[in-house]
Design a protein with these regions (language model features):
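Conserved NTP-donor binding/palm subdomain of two-metal-ion nucleotidyltransferases/polymerases, i.e.
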Residues: 2-139, 145-237
C-alpha cells in the first residue's frame, strides 16, 4: 500500500483539525493502540510531529512511536531520528536517576518516622504501559508524608550546645521536619509552607516538595470531603 503524505494529497497543510488527528494517531501508535498512521509522512510532517512532542513534553513517548512506525516501513528522516533518539536516551537516564532518588528519599523519611507516598510524575509511572514508563518526561519529586500518630520529635535551635526536641503532630510535624532538613544541610532558608506542601532540600539538583495534603479542591465543601477521604485512607498507601 502506498503511503500518502499529509503535506500533499491526503490532508491539507492548513487544516489544523486534520493535523491534530495525525498527532493523536501518532500517540496511539506509541501506546500500542494503533499499528500505523492513516497517511504517510514527508519530512515536514515528521518535523511537525517532533515539534508537537517537544511542546507537549512527549519527546520520549513520541520516540516509541518512531520506533514502531520504522518497523512497519514508515521511516523518520535519519538526522531527525538520531536527534530524537538522543533526547529519548537522556530522558531514560533522567528517569532512572529520579527513581533511585525517590527510593532513597522515601527510605530516609520512613526511617525518620514518616510514612511516604510518591505523587504525580514518578508516582504515576505504574499507570503507563511498561515500555513507556522510562520515557515519560521527568520533573521534580513530590512526596506525600504522613507522621506517626504519636508525632515526631524535632530538634530545635536553642542558642547553646544542648540539643532539645519538641514533639510535633499532624501537619506541623511534616512542616517542621522539612525545615529541619534545611538546617541539617546547612542551608540558611526558612521554607514557606502553603496550604498543601512545603519545599524540602533538593537532591543533586532535583527539586523536592513535601506534601501534607496530596491535593485540594477550590470548593470548600468538596475539599473538606476530599481531605477527610485522604485522612481515612492515608495509611492504605
Amino acid at each position: 500500500m502506498s503511503m500518502r503524505s499529509i503535506s500533499s494529497g491526503c490532508w491539507s497543510r492548513n487544516d489544523n483539525w486534520l493535523y491534530m488527528t495525525l498527532f493523536f494517531e501518532f500517540l496511539q501508535v506509541a501506546m500500542g493502540n494503533r499499528k500505523s498512521l492513516s497517511c504517510g509522512n514527508k519530512d515536514a510532517d515528521w518535523q511537525r510531529l517532533f515539534d508537537f512532542c517537544k511542546r507537549q513534553a512527549l519527546i520520549g513517548v513520541g520516540f516509541t512511536a518512531v520506533e514502531k512506525l520504522h518497523a512497519v516501513g514508515v521511516v523518520c528522516p535519519a538526522a531527525l531520528r538520531m536527534q530524537w533518539m538522543a533526547l529519548a536516551l537522556q530522558i531514560e537516564k533522567r528517569n532512572g536517576l529520579l527513581n533511585q532518588q525517590c527510593s532513597h528519599l522515601a527510605g530516609r523519611y520512613e526511617h525518620d518516622g514518616l510514612s511516604t507516598c510518591i505523587l504525580k510524575g514518578q508516582g504515576n509511572l505504574l499507570n503507563y504501559p511498561e515500555e513507556l514508563r522510562i520515557r515519560r518526561m521527568p520533573g521534580d519529586i513530590d512526596v506525600w508524608c504522613i507522621p506517626q500518630k504519636d508525632g515526631l520529635d524535632i530538634a530545635v535551635a536553642t542558642g547553646n550546645k544542648n540539643v532539645e526536641y519538641v514533639n510535633y503532630r499532624g501537619v506541623n510535624a511534616v512542616i517542621e521536619y522539612a525545615r529541619m532538613q534545611f538546617r541539617l544541610c546547612g542551608i540558611d532558608k526558612q521554607p514557606r509552607a502553603i496550604y498543601h506542601h512545603i519545599d524540602a532540600p533538593s537532591i543533586d539538583g532535583t527539586e523536592v516538595e513535601i506534601h501534607y495534603k496530596p491535593s485540594f479542591c477550590r470548593s470548600l465543601i468538596r475539599n473538606r470531603r476530599m481531605q477527610k477521604w485522604f485522612a481515612d485512607h492515608a495509611y492504605e498507601c
